[in-house]
Amino acid sequence: MHLFYTPDIEGDIYTLNADESRHCVRVLRLGAGEAVSLVDGKGTWYEGVIERAEVRGCEIRITDRRELY
């Protein structure tokens, strides 16, 4: 599973910025329906599923949140 840093995550849908989206779609070749992990740098780990895989904005639906520390 792939991990992305998302310092400003809120709500149940998160859109990766353009650089992260391009990396996700073009380099890692991830697409809709694939699972990813996200971390906010404040101690919370998120699990999600890619809803829309586009180079300019990859949309992820958050399925689980865990406070790690």
Where are these regions (language model features)?
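Acidic/glycine-rich phosphate/pyrophosphate-binding loops and surrounding catalytic core
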Residues: 1-69
